[in-house]
């Protein structure tokens, strides 16, 4: 039932996927806590502590049916979330109550869960980036040879191709993918470290047997699916980990904003558009409007994501000695919402990249309006071959280009540079001779080949290795 009398995050109601929302949900968090308590009990039993199979079986029987009401009521009394859930779990598991959380500190479940959740979230981000790359690969291949204007300073420069421009977007997303893969590979559990990272409580439990303590930690690590634990820590793992992870995710915001901005500008030129639904309304006052609202939303969310990375940066710097609680409130907002923002951006990118619309005739017309300027050097070389003076012709072309530009800008008329060159006896060229130099395909360089090589050498290996992530389709809520 909808709740209209309280604030609910737009990430939950409008933007983020159910999958990402579940990853950062209380249910996923507290179920992971219970998995960690079970893993600890098993590891401690294996090293000789008095823990029975019956106790472990009882813990496993209730690992998913969390008695939230009991935990909530207890937290109101003791003001401690971890001990409230230890208590609630103990109510369900009376035989195992005495060995839950044995030797551990709150950060055993809190920090280890945060690392596990970050890995799950990174893997979902990774999956969706690959889906976007797959969509753009098809687009780039289809349009790899279609000439279009290239821009520097947002002014027409030379020509590129529609597909080649798409590879620029893809290359940045590929860079994000590499960084996210790096962060996944570097993630390590906090492990079993005790209250200030010294493992003092486990020294007491195992009578100073370091080998057993290290074995417990390695066992827990393996049970949770990790290859390593942090080598040293205070009460928490270093908050630089959060900064590194969110920085990688925020890189996606940069790439997405650049791509979405390009599409918005191209929509203004009427060369390309994002998908537009049959019943979509662009403006309440202007029925003809086709606003690039999805790409605008990508840009809006990307700004949020890029700024959000400042939170873990400052949090990392304010951790005094072994730990303060400066991190907790900020971290639970910044990390979750950073990933939710990235997820929302990727949902829109998946939708947009799956339905980009190109208008070839507009693209061609805009090319042909500028091509006479771009072809001036070729025209000059042809006239030189017929006996013209290179320096004189260069000056004549400059004068014609300035005059033709004035006609376009001041009079709103078509570019008449070709007619000016044809009428200038210094060139001695017929219209047919001039127009042979006006094939757009001759001005795109190796664009089509570059697309082929990029897709073959960089993108296709990624798609082949992650075939299950190709072909994703997203329906947006709004």
Q: How should these model regions be labeled?
A:
Residues 236-271, 280-341:
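A conserved active-site cap/scaffold subdomain adjacent to cofactor or substrate pockets
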Residues 21-25, 70-72, 280-300, 322-337, ...:
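Short beta-alpha connecting loops at secondary-structure transitions
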Residues 218-235:
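A short, charged helix-loop
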Residues 40-43, 125, 129-132, 136-139, ...:
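Amphipathic alpha-helices that form helix-helix packing interfaces
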Residues 304-390, 396:
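Long, amphipathic alpha-helical stalk/connector segments used for oligomerization, subunit docking
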Residues 273, 396-403:
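Active/binding-pocket-proximal capping segment
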Residues 137, 141-163, 273-289, 322-329, ...:
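Glycine-rich cofactor-pocket loops
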Residues 2-200, 206-221, 282-283, 293-297, ...:
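A helix-coil-helix interface module used to build multimeric assemblies
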């Amino acid at each position: 039932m909808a709740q209209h009398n309280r604030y609910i995050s737009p990430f939950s109601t409008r933007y983020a996927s159910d999958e990402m929302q579940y990853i950062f949900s209380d249910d996923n968090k507290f179920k992971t806590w219970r998995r960690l308590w079970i893993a600890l009990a098993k590891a401690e039993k294996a090293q000789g502590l008095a823990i029975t199979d019956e106790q472990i079986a009882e813990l496993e029987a209730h690992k998913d049916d969390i008695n939230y009401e009991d935990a909530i009521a207890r937290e109101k009394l003791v003001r401690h979330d971890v001990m409230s859930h230890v208590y609630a779990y103990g109510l369900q598991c009376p035989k195992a109550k005495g060995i839950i959380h044995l030797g551990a500190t709150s950060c055993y479940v809190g920090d280890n869960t945060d690392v596990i959740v970050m890995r799950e979230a990174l893997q979902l981000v990774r999956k969706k980036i690959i889906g976007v790359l797959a969509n753009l690969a098809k687009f780039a291949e289809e349009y790899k040879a279609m000439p279009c204007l290239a821009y520097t300073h947002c002014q027409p420069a030379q020509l590129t191709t529609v597909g080649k421009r798409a590879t620029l977007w893809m290359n940045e997303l590929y860079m994000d993918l590499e960084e996210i893969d790096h962060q996944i590979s570097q993630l390590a559990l906090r492990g079993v470290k005790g209250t200030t990272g010294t493992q003092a409580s486990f020294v007491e439990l195992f009578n100073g047997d370091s080998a057993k303590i290290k074995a417990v930690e390695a066992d827990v690590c393996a049970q949770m699916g990790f290859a390593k634990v942090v080598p040293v820590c205070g009460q928490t793992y270093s908050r630089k980990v959060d900064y590194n992870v969110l920085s990688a995710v925020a890189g996606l915001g940069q790439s997405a904003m650049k791509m979405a901005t390009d599409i918005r500008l191209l929509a203004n030129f009427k060369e390309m558009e994002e998908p537009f639904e049959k019943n979509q309304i662009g403006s309440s006052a202007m029925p003809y409007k086709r606003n690039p609202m999805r790409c605008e939303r990508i840009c809006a969310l990307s700004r949020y994501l890029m700024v959000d990375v400042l939170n873990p940066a400052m949090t990392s710097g304010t951790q005094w000695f072994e730990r303060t609680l400066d991190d907790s409130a900020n971290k639970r907002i910044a990390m979750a919402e950073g990933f939710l923002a990235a997820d929302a951006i990727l949902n829109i990118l998946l939708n947009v990249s799956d339905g980009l619309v190109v208008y070839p005739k507009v693209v061609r017309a805009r090319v042909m309006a500028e091509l006479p300027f771009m072809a001036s050097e070729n025209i000059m070389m042809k006239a030189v071959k017929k006996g013209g003076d290179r320096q004189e012709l260069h000056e004549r072309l400059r004068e014609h280009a300035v005059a033709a530009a004035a006609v376009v800008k001041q009079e709103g008329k078509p570019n008449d540079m070709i007619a000016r060159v044809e009428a200038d006896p210094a060139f001695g060229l017929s219209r047919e001779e001039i127009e042979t130099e006006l094939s757009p395909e001759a001005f795109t360089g190796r664009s089509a080949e570059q697309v082929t090589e990029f897709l073959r050498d960089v993108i296709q290996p990624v798609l082949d290795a992650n075939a299950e992530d190709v072909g994703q389709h997203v329906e947006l809520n709004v």
